[in-house]
């Protein structure tokens, strides 16, 4: 098949879960014998591309798209059916580039990476006879509804409750009724979509990177790590919760360190006052960061889809401590290959137990790695993907 993969960010460099998922999808399609072209946006938030990391044999095209959020744009969306956070990706140059590709190549399949690209559905349908499939990285209106519940009463909460969340819910439900197929990243998301449309659909998670292996940490300190972009509200709010409610109590009189890494640190974070915390900012090597931790924490309370960092850490044989939401959609076994907790008291108790019984870290990490290798093998997932698209 000749396949066009349309993305709202470059798949390289792989600095977040979405770019990793896109990059993996390109490779999975390629390994099944398909010829893949990638058309991606370069936005103000994600302006980079790393040509050295691109897959050989894949044609990559990029278009600069502003896509920045503004108050004026948010207010204007009150009078439009499309949520502003989606509408901001509409761009004439990107649209014309897409049309040129569709009219220049006879594609068999168009893969839109995320519901945000649904604004180009009509363009794809008009200029191509290819099957159109959306890969839903999340249920977006679920994320925003959960985020809304975390906010204090005010203008932002009112806007989300009365404008954006209802708009987004209608937009997502109407979009998936038009497409030819849907790929969800988690079975939880798939169950929602299955209630809304009868189009062919499947759940295919992000694969584990099986080339990686855990290495013993040599530092004398008990290291706990957090990895995530802090311009994403669930990460930011979850990190603050962990520091306030858990770390400030756990770290007292212990030789421990909490290392925080990720993109787009807000200035506010540098005003926080917590002991035994290292703010590392954006890092070059996420794998090395994970391998240097004894525990990876995922304290998020909103969002949907799948946390790629959980898959990565577990595949490296690391002990992951997460909220239930943080591990949602991933086949895990609480107490065996991961530790799940949702209250400060439970989190604190688990950390104290691991601090006193560090042999548990290796046992849980070993089980985690075993689970990732058996459940999230790239070859097995690529085979499922192949069966799905050939049946469309």
Annotate each language-model stretch with its function.
Residues 162-213:
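Donor nucleotide-sugar binding/catalytic pocket of nucleotide-sugar-dependent glycosyltransferases
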Residues 72-84, 133-170, 229:
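Acceptor-binding helix/loop patch of EC 2.4 sugar-transfer enzymes
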């Amino acid at each position: 098949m000749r396949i066009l993969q349309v993305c709202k960010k470059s798949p390289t460099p792989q600095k977040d879960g979405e770019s990793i998922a896109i990059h993996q999808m390109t490779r999975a399609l390629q390994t099944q014998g398909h010829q893949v072209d990638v058309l991606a946006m370069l936005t103000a938030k994600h302006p980079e591309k790393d040509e050295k990391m691109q897959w050989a044999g894949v044609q990559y095209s990029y278009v600069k798209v502003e896509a920045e959020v503004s108050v004026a744009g948010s207010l204007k969306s009150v009078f439009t059916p499309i949520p502003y956070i989606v509408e901001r990706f509409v761009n004439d140059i990107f649209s014309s580039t897409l049309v040129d590709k569709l009219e220049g190549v006879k594609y068999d399949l168009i893969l839109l990476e995320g519901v945000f690209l649904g604004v180009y559905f009509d363009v794809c349908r008009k200029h191509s006879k290819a099957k159109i499939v959306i890969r839903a990285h999340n249920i977006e209106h679920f994320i925003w509804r959960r985020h809304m519940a975390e906010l204090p009463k005010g203008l932002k909460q009112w806007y989300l409750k009365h404008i954006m969340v209802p708009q987004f819910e209608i937009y997502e439900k109407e979009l998936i009724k038009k497409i030819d197929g849907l790929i969800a990243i988690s079975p939880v998301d798939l169950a929602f979509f299955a209630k809304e449309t009868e189009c062919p659909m499947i759940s295919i998670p992000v694969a584990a990177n099986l080339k990686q292996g855990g290495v013993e940490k040599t530092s004398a300190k008990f290291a706990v790590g957090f990895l995530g972009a802090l311009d994403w509200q669930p990460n930011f709010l979850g990190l603050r919760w962990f520091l306030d409610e858990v770390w400030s109590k756990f770290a007292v009189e212990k030789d421990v360190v909490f290392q925080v890494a990720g993109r787009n640190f807000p200035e506010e974070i540098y005003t926080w006052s917590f002991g035994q915390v290292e703010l590392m900012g954006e890092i070059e090597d996420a794998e090395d960061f994970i391998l240097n931790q004894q525990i990876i924490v995922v304290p998020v309370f909103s969002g949907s889809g799948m946390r790629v960092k959980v898959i990565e850490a577990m595949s490296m044989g690391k002990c992951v401590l997460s909220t239930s939401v943080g591990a949602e959609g991933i086949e895990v076994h609480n107490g065996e290959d991961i530790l799940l907790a949702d209250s400060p008291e439970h989190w604190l108790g688990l950390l104290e137990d691991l601090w006193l019984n560090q042999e548990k870290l290796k046992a849980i990490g070993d089980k985690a790695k075993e689970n990732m290798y058996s459940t999230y093998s790239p070859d097995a997932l690529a085979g499922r993907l192949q069966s799905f698209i050939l049946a469309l």
